Curated annotation (Swiss-Prot):
Keywords: Cardiomyopathy, Chaperone, Differentiation, Disulfide bond, Endoplasmic reticulum, Glycoprotein, Lectin, Metal-binding, Repeat, Signal, Spermatogenesis, Zinc
Pfam family, one: Calreticulin
GO biological process: cell differentiation; ERAD pathway; protein folding; spermatogenesis
Gene Ontology cellular component list: endoplasmic reticulum lumen; endoplasmic reticulum membrane; nuclear envelope
Subcellular location: Endoplasmic reticulum lumen
SUPFAM superfamilies for this protein: Concanavalin A-like lectins/glucanases, P-domain of calnexin/calreticulin
Signal sequence range: 1-19
Carbohydrate-modified residues: N42, N201
Organism: Homo sapiens (Human)
Region (4 X approximate repeats): 191-245
Protein name per UniProt: Calreticulin-3
Gene: CALR3
Main location: endoplasmic reticulum
Functional note: During spermatogenesis, may act as a lectin-independent chaperone for specific client proteins such as ADAM3. Required for sperm fertility. CALR3 capacity for calcium-binding may be absent or much lower than that of CALR.
């Protein structure tokens, strides 16, 4: 048993060693997060963030994240990391978000930016590569955005992906693979997957061409030779004995008529079978415009609007390894999700108990006040 555990541990360590982690943030060092994250000063009215685990949590320190603090505000904050390209690699983007204020209208999504982003002036017009996460507004909008920037345009997934709308922490994961497949997960479970080119309506941008027919493949029809003649000499005859060439000229040898070209003769090299071939990707076109590649990823941030504040963002991760992301999610959100719900349930019971006690006090106070009122009225009548 011990040997098996050691082997499992070794495999896990090997996986960690093979994974490339481009960015990881858990906010475990207190206020030092301000050294890594930069608040935009583009607009003095932007809302501010604070580090908080909220009113209820699974672990007071581990569940601390960036929390919005002001109602009816835009928010803009970002963090840099070493620029990289995901060309030929899987790209995994993951984070947790908790709308403990029971979101009525506002964003809970993140954005991934190119390395040349101007952090100090980050705003709604700043170009981004990827926008991913929940967006809620009223009864109509309760969706997960997955927007990709491609060829100077933003393209959104055409499928309606529902988000979570309760007040608990949820784990959101986006996986983009080099084979142009993708996966969207919530709480570790796949809720949508498919093809990037089809689910973003990008098929026209990924062109396909038919390769030229093989040069050694015979054509399906043959043309009549340019020197084709309808008649030919009758080789069985000879010049007449009394024919005088000086007087009569050249002897016109008898000619025989050839059968018509179409009259049952089959020209050589004819193949009536259809030449079968498969469509092939135009690799030159795709190399220049690949639908899942971003050349200069260098920042992650929050740029959103909220009517009611209180959302907490935590456990940010950008990596090239799906298994690492899965394990990271289990080690963070997976460890605290249960205790978080337990604490919320306890608080709810306490609040209900307190509300009943206050109601009973009000009722009791009302009865006492009524008795005092009747008593005073009785004495006034007696005095009269």
């Amino acid at each position: 048993m011990a040997r098996a555990l050691v082997q499992l541990w070794a495999i896990c360590m090997l996986r960690v060693a093979l994974a490339t982690v481009y960015f990881q943030e858990e906010f475990l060092d207190g206020e030092h997060w301000r050294n890594r994250w930069l608040q935009s000063t583009n607009d003095s009215r932007f809302g501010h963030f604070r580090l908080s685990s909220g009113k209820f949590y699974g672990h007071k320190e581990k569940d601390k994240g960036l929390q919005t603090t002001q109602n009816g505000r835009f928010y803009a904050i970002s963090a840099r990391f070493k620029p990289f390209s995901n060309k030929g690699k899987t790209l995994v983007i993951q984070y947790t978000v908790k709308h403990e204020q029971k979101m009525d209208c506002g964003g809970g999504y993140i954005k991934v930016f190119p390395a040349d982003i101007d952090q100090k002036n980050l705003n709604g017009k700043s170009q981004y590569y990827i926008m991913f996460g929940p967006d809620i507004c009223g009864f109509d909008i309760k969706k997960v955005h997955v927007i990709l920037h491609f060829k100077n345009k933003y393209h959104e997934n055409k499928k309606l992906i529902r988000c979570k709308v309760d007040g608990f922490t949820h784990l959101y994961t986006l996986i983009l693979r080099p084979d142009l497949s993708y996966d969207v997960k919530i709480d570790g479970q796949s809720i949508e997957s498919g093809s990037i080119e089809y689910d973003w309506n990008l098929t026209s941008l990924k062109k396909e061409t038919s390769p030229a027919e093989s040069k050694d493949w015979e054509q399906t029809k043959d043309n009549k030779a340019q020197d084709w003649e309808k008649h030919f000499l009758d080789a069985s005859t000879s010049k007449q004995s009394d024919w005088n060439g000086d007087l009569d000229g050249d002897w016109p040898a008898p000619m025989l008529q050839k059968p018509p070209y179409q009259d049952g003769l089959k020209p050589e090299g004819i193949h009536k079978d259809v030449w079968l071939h498969r469509k092939m990707k135009n690799t030159d076109y795709l190399t220049q415009y690949d639908l899942s590649e971003f050349e200069n990823i260098g920042a992650i941030g929050l740029e959103l609007w909220q009517v009611r504040s209180g959302t907490i963002f935590d456990n940010f991760l950008i990596t090239d390894d799906e298994e690492y992301a899965d394990n990271f999610g289990k080690a963070t959100w997976g460890e605290t999700k249960g205790p978080e719900r337990e604490m919320d349930a306890i608080q709810a019971k306490e609040e209900m108990k307190k509300a009943r006690e206050e109601e009973e006090e009000e009722l009791l106070s009302g009865k006492i006040n009524r008795h005092e009122h009747y008593f005073n009225q009785f004495h006034r009548r007696n005095e009269l």
